[in-house]
């Protein structure tokens, strides 16, 4: 039977049956838990914020460890994404954690394209996963999923409003990743200023249409706490790995001349709230939202570009072969059209070149004729001057000959007079 002949079963036609004995599929949740624990989990965090705002310190504080970090310069030519992957274990749960730092973000004078490197990195991870899915022999079980599950956007504690760079970047990212805005180094402004700053940030995000991640409230188990925590966004956090003695206890805190800011004291900052929401309550939802919402949007757009599309229930579905043939015909038609355009462009170029050559030839011919006329005129002038010169030379030679003849006659006459005088004396 063909696939198109199979009748679709509606929900009304499904029946609920009672079993007369135990079957065993009630162990499916236990099987899933066992498989997940064996396979392990991955979680990828993107930290976006200016250099020196405390991204590395907060990550160390969140996971209660010290990650490898490199000192970042404020003189980067552009934004560079630097991923680091670590294997963590808590009890019998393995976590492959990837932290991606945005090196040089916001350090350039021209910040117009600062977000592009971040967007390109997220799209590249989506593309890598899509290419793995489209393989004939795919291995998603062993594939290291590098898609970004959450973006912690570090906001500079100015106490006034969001920077233009922050608004533009979050607007470009909100359809690609789950954004949780946090106010970094919240101990640098007063509580009253911090409260006003939070209200201002949320107001600007709403007015500019920036969609940040909202903790889910559809699950009764976490609906109440998530609903309360949504009202505390953005979280104002303080990070520190140093331990300070407060009373009889050592706590993680920042020591100042005027007092101590305790990291895990909820009256001092929202670090505990961030850790609860990010790790202990909503980590799996962040992973799920990345796959079912952001990646699916990217995947749908890419498949539509490739020619795939969903069909209405009443229309006959397209097979993969039909889609391939349709796309192939489209590409061949486009190729022929491009070839015809190139051929026509070549013909036009040849005609233009021929016309230019003819114009050049005509110009050269006219120039040649002009030079020929000038040459003839100059030759005639030279010939006339040559004739005049010959006539002058002939006239000169005639006068010279006559002069020489006269001189000869005069010499002979003067030489004969002394001879006559000598003869007369002898006589």
From Swiss-Prot:
Residues 49-56 are annotated as: G1 motif. One of its GO terms (biological process) is regulation of SNARE complex assembly. Residues 184-187 are annotated as: G4 motif. Residues 321-409 form a coiled coil. Residues 39-305 form the Septin-type G domain. Residues 373-427 are annotated as: Disordered. Pfam families: Septin. It is found in: Cytoplasm; Cytoplasm, Cytoskeleton; Synapse; Cell projection, Axon. Residues 101-104 are annotated as: G3 motif. The keyword Nucleotide-binding applies. Residues 374-389 have a biased composition (Basic and acidic residues). One of its GO terms (cellular component) is axon. Residues 406-418 have a biased composition (Polar residues). GTP binds at residues 49-56, 104, 185-193, 239, 254. CDD domains: CDC_Septin. GO terms for molecular function: GTP binding. Keywords: Cell projection, Coiled coil, Cytoplasm, Cytoplasmic vesicle, Cytoskeleton, GTP-binding, Membrane, Nucleotide-binding, Synapse. Belongs to the TRAFAC class TrmE-Era-EngA-EngB-Septin-like GTPase superfamily. Septin GTPase family. This is Septin-8. The lineage of its organism: Eukaryota, Metazoa, Chordata, Craniata, Vertebrata. The gene is septin8.
